Amino acid sequence: FRSLGAVYQNFKYLAMLLSIGKDSTILFWLARKAFFGHCPIPLVHIDTTYKIPAMIEYRDRVAKEWGLNLVVGKNQKALDEGMNHEKGRLVCCEALKTQGLQCIMEEHGYTGLILGIRRDEEGTRAKERYFSPRDKNFEWNFKDQPPELWDQYKTSFAEDTHIRIHPILHWTELNV
């Protein structure tokens, strides 16, 4: 996978996830380099309310100073119903992150998401592809993945899918 510029040209409704962690920050830096100091791709931050205030202040300050299109999503309903980490990591992440992202995608019509994940982070991510389809329920069939050989990628998918694009998938912790 070589070019964020090509991805930007080929996906009509594209956004980039920004968790404010090291990987998404590197990805944002790469996007700014690809677009000569500007990032034309909307940045989506899913606010779980668990980030330290200094991170949120940094996010807001950078977005304002650099004129970024920052979209902040939050599953307020789940938070109002008492969702928190004490209910279990998987349950909490599903409610606050996944459902929060689903709401933002529906609201803004995004069909492509750029993420800063790496294969070496976790077992399931080792099965990811640079262009990874999800169905309308955000389900991913990891058993039915097309090969990605010699920089040839499948980039067209069924109508009801959105595509997750992973530019730094091949990076390691040391690369970051």
Briefly describe each language-model feature range.
Residues 1-176:
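Nucleotide-activated chemistry modules centered on ATP-dependent adenylation/adenylyltransferase
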